[in-house]
Amino acid sequence: MAGLMLLSLMALLGLGAGAPLCLSRQLRMQGDYVLGGLFPLGTAEDTGLSDRTQPNATVCTRFSSLGLLWALAMKMAVEEVNNRSTLLPGLRLGYDLFDTCSEPVVAMKPSLMFMAKAGSCDIAAYCNYTQYQPRVLAVIGPHSSELALITGKFFSFFLMPQVSYGASTDRLSNRETFPSFFRTVSSDRVQAVAMVELLQELGWNWVAAVGSDDEYGRQGLSLFSSLANARGICIAHEGLVPLPHTSSLRLGTVQGLLHQVNQSSVQVVVLFSSTRAARTLFSYSIHCRLSPKVWVASEAWLTSDLVMTLPGMAEVGTVLGFLQQGAPIPEFPSYVQTCLALAADPAFCASLDAEQPGLEEHVVGPRCPQCDHVTLEAMSAGLLHHQTFAAYAAVYGVAQALHNTLLCNASGCPPREPVRPWQLLENMYNLTFRVRGLALQFDARGNVNMDYDLKLWVWRDLKPELRTVGAFNGRLKVWHSQMSWHTPGNQRPVSQCSRQCGEGQVRRVKGFHSCCYDCVDCKAGTYQRSPDDLLCTQCDQNQWSPDRSTRCFPRRLTFLAWGQPAVLVLLILLALALGLVLVALGLFIRHRDSPLVQASGGPRACFGLACLGLVCLSVLLFPGQPGPASCLAQQPLLHLPLTGCLSTLFLQAAQIFVGSELPSSWADQLRRCLQGPWAWLLVLLALLAEAALCAWYLVAFPPEVVTDWWVLPTQVLVHCRMRSWISFGLLHAINAMLAFLCFLGTFLVQSRPGRYNGARGLTFAMLAYFITWISFVPLFANVHVAYQPTVQMAAILLCALGILATFHLPKCYLLLQQLELNNPEFFLGDDARGQGSSGSGGKET
């Protein structure tokens, strides 16, 4: 500890006195295998590349303390490898570190020097470089994606392993273009995925996306935009921020971009930018007084002092972003202090000059003249920078690959001819190595999968501190209780174009953005499958749903059930009708020899009553679950008994018409045809004709059992479907004709005084028939299909009750209450006298 304090004091005193250091001469060390290094030790404030007419040198005027710290991290790692007895025993790694000035024209010079033949400054031209031995075995760096895209293609031609500690563009994962490129940072794709998941977690789907106008910003912005669109996040505005050294005309576009963002409802801005472009954007936003926003930062500028120390940054809003995790290097600050202290020691500097003659500075220029005037205070702010570990780990990755290539063990590395870069490259693929207890592995595309911390800027005095508020390791975790916002009451900002739709609603997009929409209710039979649906999903045919539903329910099988109230009422009506039929039939049988029964047709009247009872019983075919047999039997078992009933009534009406309207000579002849066997023959013919119609109906247009999924909102209806209205009407044709003839034969008949008016009963019976079935047709055609069987049952029973009430029940009343009228003169009249004189008796035979 005392020695460390002494070294620190020496460094402070030496640097404070303004004495030049020899730190730049510590950027090179000889070894059995040398690693090249490309670091942004300085930057050029005004490169003037557009005015460059000769391939001369570019002067780096501004010093970058972070670049120097990353270079020292590589230097420290090489020295640790050399001091370890297990990784490369008996061998010594060297390093050769150069400044890139963050410019391609500067980075290409040391890149060419790395590929020069060992021991010279020349690159020889060969048809085959298999046996070629360049100055370095592998290259660490560069830091930026823009430089890595250039140097990566160059080194890939020679299959020179290159491990970057900061280039994150996803284009570098292309193995066909960059077969020798590796990196100890994750691809921008991982960071973009984390950003999109963060927006989803916090409910922000209406954002602005801005990137720097360089490879890092353009590629990152493109990745983020495609991933955001795939996740339903809409980008209201998208733009690029020019780099500071571009023309003032292009820099003026920043104001227009900020104006668009300020005029919109966007409360969240994703800034995928390099440090210098981010500083430019915030300088303009502070000047233009942009309303505070949430800024989702990319890793490149999240921890940048250049941005953090910008005056007015505390007023821009909330800043949060993802920072790659890494293992701590607690010895690194003291190592930096040691390097600075040694650089101020003249004896140490003299020893470097003796050990490293011929630095070839006449070829590449001074390595880092600004490094010889650095202060410890200037470097202290970046001592704990997160990317220091990435530069440190890159050395260990190359060392482990060399260990595997040389087949080293605990006792040493077997002697062999020098390893060439392409041989080392073979052992870099899918390499697993450990750094500070952390296991790392290059995947098939040269990337390492690193976890991220979600960091939030929390302002303390003039500079923000980084608070960890979450993590991303393939899945996002956010610690909401640790979040703090710029809004009043520390409420989470809302950045949505439209409100979230409720349950059972889908989005109807307005314009070009899927996040701007109206909420539309899902109608019955459809449902909302997910909150992001644009269309309601139709339920399956065996399912149903109410309005604004989020699921479908199974349909219940339904039909005209026995227990339904309407069916129970009709069954009571059926019992009444059957009871009346049985009472009337019993009275007619009991009084079968009476004039009343004989005048009504005798046995034919009983037959007609029995058929009327069968008509009533036919309604029992309609309730219950329909089947093929019940569907086929419904109409024939209704119409055949009805034909039998109406045919007997037709004979009764014909007798009344003949006896009342025709001359006696004709009446006697026709009366004999309407009685006895001839009458039964007419009944049989009518039944046969109706049976033929029923047979044709069943063959040509058979009713079918139908499972109808859509006629009821929540149930599936099973019913018998009539296939033709014409065939249904023809089934009624014979019965309608018999009823019409009955009505026609009795309507105009004048009853004789002192005789029973049978014509009136038949007239009203036929009126009941026609009123029932004429009313049935429009009602049946327009009623819901679920109620059609009920309507037909009601029509059948009303028709039967109408005939009973108007024709049969009055006669039953006479048989029960007015027996004195049950005489031949009242019912038979002249027929009774004629039968009495002929001695034929009063009974029909």
From Swiss-Prot:
GO BP of this protein: detection of chemical stimulus involved in sensory perception of sweet taste; sensory perception of sweet taste; sensory perception of umami taste
One Pfam family recorded for the sequence: 7tm_3
Entry's transmembrane regions: 569-589, 602-622, 638-658, 681-701, 728-748, 761-781, 790-810
Compartments where found: Cell membrane
One annotated Gene Ontology cellular component of this protein: plasma membrane
Residues in the Cytoplasmic compartment per record: 590-601, 659-680, 749-760, 811-845
The organism's place on the tree of life at top rank: Eukaryota
Positions of glycan attachment: N128, N262
Topological domains, Extracellular: 19-568, 623-637, 702-727, 782-789
Topology within the bilayer: Multi-pass membrane protein
Predominant localisation class: membrane
Record's keyword terms, sorted: Cell membrane, G-protein coupled receptor, Glycoprotein, Membrane, Receptor, Signal, Transducer, Transmembrane, Transmembrane helix
PROSITE patterns assigned to the protein according to its UniProt record, in alphabetical order: G_PROTEIN_RECEP_F3_4 (PS50259)
Keyword Signal: yes
Family: Belongs to the G-protein coupled receptor 3 family. TAS1R subfamily.
Record's subunit section: Forms homodimers or heterodimers with TAS1R1 and TAS1R2.
Function description: Putative taste receptor. TAS1R1/TAS1R3 responds to the umami taste stimulus (the taste of monosodium glutamate). TAS1R2/TAS1R3 recognizes diverse natural and synthetic sweeteners. TAS1R3 is essential for the recognition and response to the disaccharide trehalose. Sequence differences within and between species can significantly influence the selectivity and specificity of taste responses.
Protein name (record): Taste receptor type 1 member 3
Species: Canis lupus familiaris (Dog)
Gene (name only): TAS1R3
